[in-house]
Amino acid sequence: MREIVHIQAGQCGNQIGAKFWEIISDEHGIDATGAYHGDSDLQLERINVYYNEASGGKYVPRAVLVDLEPGTMDSVRSGPFGQIFRPDNFVFGQSGAGNNWAKGHYTEGAELVDSVLDVVRKEAESCDCLQGFQLTHSLGGGTGSGMGTLLISKIREEYPDRIMNTYSVVPSPKVSDTVVEPYNATLSVHQLVENTDETYCIDNEALYDICFRTLKLTTPTYGDLNHLVSLTMSGVTTCLRFPGQLNADLRKLAVNMVPFPRLHFFMPGFAPLTSRGSQQYRALTVPELTQQMFDAKNMMAACDPRHGRYLTVAAIFRGRMSMKEVDEQMLNIQNKNSSYFVEWIPNNVKTAVCDIPPRGLKMSATFIGNSTAIQELFKRISEQFTAMFRRKAFLHWYTGEGMDEMEFTEAESNMNDLVSEYQQYQEATADEDAEFEEEQEAEVEEN
């Protein structure tokens, strides 16, 4: 069986991760003690992707929980599914990273990283055929961003041919915990560009807007935001957890989604977005789902896909529905909005259908888009970064942990390069390539 090792780092990562395990345990019929009470063989057919089987027929999440302070881990442990995790897989420090990337990456985190890698190694060794790793973390804090990226690069060293997948919560000015978020995020993106195969960008700003506008919640809590994130994660991983044809493992997903190695930052979306109480009042049709799923209001990253073009798209439909209708609707969307899809990747939209809907819904759809509009998100962080870095504000917190200003400059230019790469492919057309090749040939002849 193709296993995935799940790692959650920092406060945000652990809270989202805990929600994720609650939701998928529920979908697979596993209760808070790890016992199976399901009603369908499909629930167990690929259970090994995320769970180890322990003695007595219990299922234990293949999860490693990491933090530099004990607080969040304690609340996960005392939460509804706290007893399902393997106690040895909680690895935490006492000092905290104080929202400082340098502490997470170079000092405090570096001290803890070996004990985390021991646990990861133990999980990886007990796998039959490991397909890769997934990390949930935020980019705005210290542990998830600094230590999370440190773990990624260490795991990359040890398992260079395994897929590395992250669910990264990107900071936003509207929902800010700390003033140094732009620094932490830029330093993290610098790492993610080089060391991950797939990164789902989840954006607090977009989540807030969804809670506010669509779900009509007047004061959204982090609990509400995390609920949305876990819906999305459950949807994105459907193909991995239930038998199906398309994108059935992390590598196939990467092959379909990533046209150029650096451009692997995806915009997730979900439909239908209904507030927690009102699901049962109406059933959606496939056309409505498709329409909603491509709508900018349903994106979990605060970028408007209409400001860019899609390089690739994967869509996952869940529930009992007609495959034919799904294909028709997806083609329909592409034909109507053909200008929003690059024409130099034909058939760049892939669709999967899974029979098992999420709890409380008859059918749902999850959207994964690799759109050039994601550059808006990086631009936003970059502007805030530059504003502070120009004055060297707050820099002493980082240099005090042994960092060099050069590293900031490098991270900044790497992120700006990423933005220009997205821009370049947004403007590229199928005809330009021919001209470009002619130019190159001419240059070769001159030389």
Swiss-Prot record:
What InterPro entries would the database entry show?
Beta-tubulin_BS (IPR013838), Beta_tubulin (IPR002453), Tub_FtsZ_C (IPR008280), Tubulin (IPR000217), Tubulin/FtsZ-like_C (IPR037103), Tubulin/FtsZ_2-layer-sand-dom (IPR018316), Tubulin/FtsZ_GTPase_sf (IPR036525), Tubulin_C (IPR023123)
Q: Where does Mg(2+) bind?
A: 69
Region annotation (Disordered) maps to: 427-447
Entries under CDD domains matching the protein:
beta_tubulin
Localization (cell): Cytoplasm, Cytoskeleton
Molecular-function GO terms, alphabetical: GTP binding; GTPase activity; metal ion binding; structural constituent of cytoskeleton
Question: Does Nucleotide-binding show up as a keyword for this record?
Answer: yes
Q: Where is the composition biased (Acidic residues)?
A: 429-447
Q: Which GO terms describe its cellular component?
A: cytoplasm; microtubule
Family matches, as SUPFAM superfamilies: Tubulin C-terminal domain-like, Tubulin nucleotide-binding domain-like
Q: Name one GO biological process term.
A: microtubule-based process
Subunit text = Dimer of alpha and beta chains. A typical microtubule is a hollow water-filled tube with an outer diameter of 25 nm and an inner diameter of 15 nM. Alpha-beta heterodimers associate head-to-tail to form protofilaments running lengthwise along the microtubule wall with the beta-tubulin subunit facing the microtubule plus end conferring a structural polarity. Microtubules usually have 13 protofilaments but different protofilament numbers can be found in some organisms and specialized cells.
Q: What does this protein do?
A: Tubulin is the major constituent of microtubules, a cylinder consisting of laterally associated linear protofilaments composed of alpha- and beta-tubulin heterodimers. Microtubules grow by the addition of GTP-tubulin dimers to the microtubule end, where a stabilizing cap forms. Below the cap, tubulin dimers are in GDP-bound state, owing to GTPase activity of alpha-tubulin.
Q: What is this protein called?
A: Tubulin beta-1 chain
